């Protein structure tokens, strides 16, 4: 399947957009943890804040993705809704998936049929997203995938939460930074990238 993963164009709320142009590490981690035959492209829209519509239109046209995933923080919700409306017009057959802090904490914000999602990945996404792609590819039910919410007609079904992954077991693979289709990440004008060294609270 062809997968397009997008992070929102909004910068951190109290910093100038030009100061923070950092990549979304979660999306490259998703890309690194799907089955190898899927073709995944990651686009951090913070790099194209003045050309969001043009960039998304170009990517949708060139890639014709089957799945489009959006990573959303709460202050980015309006941008996500606008992007979903655009994507519905550009890719009426694509499955639109949202994940990240905001959909995990407020899934009801994404249940509108016009600007809402088809599927919500709640909590840690790597395993849930991989299982989602497998189910969609095989035409299987989504009902047995922990950590998933999915549209059933006009209503959403919320599956049970997925347990937090235990990284010491090696159950997650490394991120795929080569899936990025945009570049030139900077922090205060200097080149930057991100690396995840831990998850969750330091104790407990």
Language-model features: locations:
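Glycine-rich beta-alpha loop elements in corrinoid/cobalamin-binding modules
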Residues: 20, 33-167
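Glycine- and acidic-residue-enriched helix-capping/strand-helix junction motifs
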Residues: 13-27
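Extreme N-terminal starter segment of soluble prokaryotic enzymes
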Residues: 1-4
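Radical SAM [4Fe-4S] cluster-binding motif and immediate context
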Residues: 22, 176-204
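Short, acidic Gly/Pro/Ser/Thr-rich loop/turn segments
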Residues: 11-13, 157, 166, 202-204
């Amino acid at each position: 399947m062809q997968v397009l993963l997008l992070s929102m164009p909004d910068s951190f709320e109290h910093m100038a957009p030009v100061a923070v142009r950092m990549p979304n590490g979660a999306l490259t981690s998703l890309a690194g943890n799907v089955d190898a035959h899927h073709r995944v492209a990651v686009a951090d829209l913070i790099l194209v804040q003045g050309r969001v519509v043009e960039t998304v239109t170009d990517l949708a046209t060139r890639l014709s993705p089957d799945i489009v995933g959006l990573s959303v923080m709460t202050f980015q919700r309006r941008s996500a809704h606008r992007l979903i409306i655009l994507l519905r017009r550009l890719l009426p057959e694509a499955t639109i998936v949202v994940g990240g802090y905001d959909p995990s904490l407020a899934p009801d914000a994404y249940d509108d049929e016009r600007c809402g999602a088809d599927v919500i990945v709640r909590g840690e996404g790597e395993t849930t997203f991989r299982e989602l792609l497998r189910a969609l590819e095989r035409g299987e039910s989504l009902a047995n995938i922990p950590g998933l919410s999915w549209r059933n007609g006009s209503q959403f079904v919320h599956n049970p939460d997925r347990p937090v992954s235990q990284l010491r077991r090696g159950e997650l693979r490394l991120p795929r930074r080569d899936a990025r289709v945009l570049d030139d990440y900077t922090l205060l004008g200097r080149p930057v990238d991100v690396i995840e060294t831990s998850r969750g609270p330091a104790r407990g």
